[in-house]
Amino acid sequence: MSAPVPQLVNISHALQASTIQQIRLDMVDFNKDCKLSSIQLARIDKYIDSLQAALNQFTKDNLHIERKEKNVTEADIQLYSGLKSMYLDYLNQLIKLKHEKQHHSTPPIANDVSLDFFVNQLPKFSPEERKNYIDNLILNKNSHNRLSKMDGLVDAVINLCVLDTSVAENVRSYMKLLDTLGFQKGSNSTGTKANLKKKLASSKAKIKDSEKEKEKEKDKSKVKMKTKLKPSPLLNNDDKNSSPSPTASTSSMKKLKSGLFNKNEAKSTESLPTSSKKKLSFSKYLNKDDADMTKLGTKRSIDVDFKVNPEASTVASNIISSSTSGSSTTTVATPASSEEPLKKKTKISVQDSNVQSILRNGKPKKARISSIKFLDDSQLIKVYGDDLPNQGLQVSPTQLKKILKPFKEGEPKEIILFEDMSIKLKPLDLMFLKNTNSDDYMDISETKGGPIHCETRTPLIYRKNFNHFNPDLNKRPPREPIEFDLNGNTNSTPTIAKAFGKNSLLLRKDRGGLPYKHVPIVKRNKYPPRPVH
């Protein structure tokens, strides 16, 4: 007979099973923590309120079960009392947990209500502890008179607001304390608010200033990394910048335009600072159709480009272009005596150590990588492990590499780390095969070059790799078995072959006639017919 089912219990306002499970899990977590945060305490309050509301509504909905009216069974009473006791049990546990943890979460000097504690001690606590302390002060009405008479309390609370600017809950608690003490209601309310605004603005300004200083430091570091390129005075002489320059530079430019280079004038031009940049002539890359450019003499040979100083060549080309654009009738002719100072100037420019060549060499530059190397000390490392001495084994770094990664091609997989090994392996003794019957050892085995001699009539391709078998082998009729030479000495060595398939001990017909153990064929004895009586 089945148990009666409760039918008159109203559970429309009862808590869901998922909510009860969540409360149970959170209570386990709350018991593990020594201190509870404000979020955890708020969650406990929420659970207490929901359980209290659910319990009150559940009792109202089931008053007929409380009165034990007609048609109320024992199953209904049992379910109602069980749910009610569960709600009460959870309520008592949560209230007790909140009382214990809230007592532990308060600061150790919770009873201290002095201005010195507000100014010096309270900022040292964590934000949660400060909030709990202030909340306890708000609830403790006996200390309100003493706090309202303190002169520097407002400034201390404002400093706490500035300290916990990012925590909104703490700021609300601080403002609530000032409100309960009456600092924001009387004539002092405007002063406290203005002071608080100033402090908060100054704290935000300090944060912004610190961020700006960090950005400036980053910009300075970036500027230091950039290389400053100084332009050449001969090439970058504009009309605006030419007026404040000295007369010596203008006269040298005029003499360069006229093309009259003397030895004394060459010495004066050598004193001018040469630019760190070099320019190459790309005349060798011009097309053959540019015949008019060759007539003007701007196209130079490759030998001149690499022998003559490129700065002087570019200056000369600029002078020729400017003179031709200025007057079409005038022509420029450089005398033969101008070649000597040019050669001297190129020699000096080549010898100058500040000038860096931009010509690429054919050989690529290899970056040197300096690796850290240590001395090979045999007493450096001590290794502990299985099959090693109890006092450990001292090895060098190279031996340690060998231990950690011993498998390399062409090297043995096992190395003897020390001479006095506690475990000595015994050599394999195969003499028992000669003493016992060899038929007992004819079985399927895998020996790749092992000590047992393998004699089988299976081709080598099938012994090494069984993927060459036809998948339709088991569908065909079995072939004729291989005949053994029984007169020969075939049983002196075991016949070893590899079976295939899911089962390693298949029948001969399923193996396609491959032998792995010689089974003698038992023929039926031909007895004389039984006499009929």
UniProtKB/Swiss-Prot annotation:
Q: Name one GO biological process term.
A: sno(s)RNA 3'-end processing
A molecular function (GO) held by this record is: RNA binding
Keyword Translocase annotated: no
Q: Where is this region: Disordered?
A: 187-254, 260-279, 321-344
Biased region (Low complexity) positions are: 242-252, 321-338
Which domain of life does the UniProt lineage start with?
Eukaryota
What cellular-component terms does GO give this entry? cytosol; mRNA cleavage and polyadenylation specificity factor complex; nucleus
Entry keywords, A to Z: mRNA processing, Nucleus, RNA-binding
RNA-binding found in the keyword field: yes
Biased segments, Basic and acidic residues type: 206-222
Chief location of this protein within or outside the cell: nucleus
Where found, per UniProt?
Nucleus
Misc remark: Present with 7450 molecules/cell in log phase SD medium.
Subunit-structure text:
Interacts with FIR1. Component of the cleavage and polyadenylation factor (CPF) complex, which is composed of PTI1, SYC1, SSU72, GLC7, MPE1, REF2, PFS2, PTA1, YSH1/BRR5, SWD2, CFT2/YDH1, YTH1, CFT1/YHH1, FIP1 and PAP1. Component of the APT complex, which is a subcomplex of CPF, and is composed of PTI1, SYC1, SSU72, GLC7, REF2, PTA1 and SWD2.
- The protein's role, per its UniProt record: RNA-binding component of the cleavage and polyadenylation factor (CPF) complex, which plays a key role in polyadenylation-dependent pre-mRNA 3'-end formation and cooperates with cleavage factors including the CFIA complex and NAB4/CFIB. Negative regulator of poly(A) synthesis. Component of the APT complex, which may be involved in polyadenylation-independent transcript 3'-end formation. REF2 is required for 3'-end formation of snoRNAs.
Q: What name appears for this protein in its UniProt entry? A: RNA end formation protein 2
Say which species the protein is native to.
Answer: Saccharomyces cerevisiae (strain ATCC 204508 / S288c)
